[in-house]
Amino acid sequence: KANGGYTVTTGNVISSDQVIDLRRRLEEINRLNPDEIRSVYRQMLGNSALSSKGGAGLGLIEMAKKTGNKLDYDFLELNKKSSYFILSKTVDTEGIGIHDKENDKPFSGGKISVLERMLAKHSIYLIWSGHLSPDVGKEVIAFTEKKLSEQDIEQSLRKRVFAILVEMIENVAKYSPGREDEEKYGMPVAMLRYKYGRYYISTGNLIRNSKTDLLKGKMDIINSLDSGELREHFRKSLSVQTDEVESTGNMGLIDMAWKSGNKLHYQLRPVNDTYSYFTITTRVDSQVL
């Protein structure tokens, strides 16, 4: 989120021999005004041969057409054969491009490259930071489901990872104090890591201090139980479940531990007199012991 809108950035490895042509295309697009961009776009759509040969060019033109102004980009050399291509665009809430003409500094993808290396170093497969409304939560879950379906992993493992992530994101949404306090004291985070054949699922969110003792008690009880005891605890909790957040949240925590087959590692860090920041991580192995 930036400048009253949102910055969308992608990065991917390309062959270094593609850099000159791709840079030329981007420079040509950025020299066009909005009317010229629409004209070129219509021309490319109307010429099937041109469209099939220049698919990447058509995609870039379409981005410029939809947002209304220039595309920011950078190329970082990785080695003699490969480069890292970074494409970035800042848009307002209506999807219209934002560009600060008074501060027209050359775009640099250095920070994106640092972020990519950090994600790779820590085996972070997916990360989300921001307010998790029910609608946003559904989008994060749908994106994760798509990413998991693309991976060559056992279906039963994929289903367990997905089910646990759904429970964890729903748990975050249940305790949300609202966007304003989250922006002041700590935004929710959801993260999926994959390391040594195991998935690690983590979330973080604000929770009111008045609820921390109850939550800690629930977590400690759940972590003291084995698989059979968790099933029995789930059955008993189900029989007394209500619509209260504490009740439904308890069911979700039990389900996470049961499906993961591992302990729920958690931490409660005081933020101020009103809130603490609650983080939880569980490991998902290929087999539940």
Where are these regions (language model features)?
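Conserved beta-strand-loop-beta-strand hairpin that lines the nucleotide-binding pocket
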Residues: 1-102, 119-123, 141, 173-289
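Amphipathic alpha-helical interaction surfaces in cytosolic regulatory modules
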Residues: 144, 165-174
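STAS-typified acidic loop motif
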Residues: 123-141
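Short, solvent-exposed positions on alpha-helices
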Residues: 155-159
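Alpha-helical phosphate/pyrophosphate-handling elements in metalloenzyme active cores
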Residues: 138-154
